[in-house]
Amino acid sequence: MAAAAGEARRVLVYGGRGALGSRCVQAFRARNWWVASIDVQENEEASANVVVKMTDSFTEQADQVTAEVGKLLGTEKVDAILCVAGGWAGGNAKSKSLFKNCDLMWKQSVWTSTISSHLATKHLKEGGLLTLAGARAALDGTPGMIGYGMAKAAVHQLCQSLAGKSSGLPPGAAAVALLPVTLDTPVNRKSMPEADFSSWTPLEFLVETFHDWITEKNRPSSGSLIQVVTTEGKTELTAASP
């Protein structure tokens, strides 16, 4: 079962060197939790690291990460696996970069989410939490960012599939996808300096949301697609209609 209230937790952060992943590592280490980062680069603040090897083969990458996480954890179980890996690339169906960007989005979102889901079947405690990184935009068509929309829609479908009884997740475990609009990250501020930052979601809000869900406070039901909408600096979570 998941740890009792007040106990130190054990968490895997897939994408632990990204903007949101780094904040998660910092915040949970500050609570004296054991936090492992899975990313293409080490996070020195993490308790442990699994460095992902870049490859064009999904099976190679999946096997490498699965094997190294298995060696790291042994028989130990974790309270949560937070998949916060991802990225963004635009382009419509006519774009010269369509194939390249679709490939990139698939690697950054679908590969990472699929590997995280498999890790959950092996290493997540009963009653544990798996979060996936969806996108509110992918609830509808995304003609200006075809690859991004397809990849995020696949993540949404994966999350809903994991809620099924025969999904392979441990008893009582929950898979939940967060569907933000725009996160307030340094990269986004640099690329969109004229944007309305009051409509962007602060990373700290998501970190605290993860903390609540890990400790089973206001945790949504498994399979939920949770929209994250920030308006005039106020962020609200609402479940997307099935």
UniProtKB/Swiss-Prot annotation:
InterPro entries: NAD(P)-bd_dom_sf, Sc_DH/Rdtase_CS, SDR_fam
The protein's enzyme class: oxidoreductase
Record's keyword annotation contains Oxidoreductase: yes
Molecular-function GO term, any one: NADPH binding
UniProt keyword annotations, A-Z: NADP, Oxidoreductase, Tetrahydrobiopterin biosynthesis
Modified residues (N6-succinyllysine): K71, K77, K94, K100
Statement: the UniProt record of this protein carries the keyword Nucleus: no
Active site: Y148
Binding site for NADP(+): 12-36
PROSITE patterns linked: ADH_SHORT
Substrates-to-products reaction catalysed: 5,6,7,8-tetrahydropteridine + NAD(+) = 6,7-dihydropteridine + NADH + H(+); 5,6,7,8-tetrahydropteridine + NADP(+) = 6,7-dihydropteridine + NADPH + H(+)
EC number, as in UniProt: 1.5.1.34
Residue stretches spanning the membrane: none
Biological processes annotated in GO: L-phenylalanine catabolic process; tetrahydrobiopterin biosynthetic process
One GO CC annotation: cytoplasm
Database matches in SUPFAM superfamilies: NAD(P)-binding Rossmann-fold domains (SSF51735)
Similarity comment: Belongs to the short-chain dehydrogenases/reductases (SDR) family.
PANTHER family, per database record: DIHYDROPTERIDINE REDUCTASE
Role noted for this protein: Catalyzes the conversion of quinonoid dihydrobiopterin into tetrahydrobiopterin.
Assembly and oligomerization: Homodimer.
Name this protein carries in UniProt: Dihydropteridine reductase
Organism for this UniProt entry: Bos taurus (Bovine)
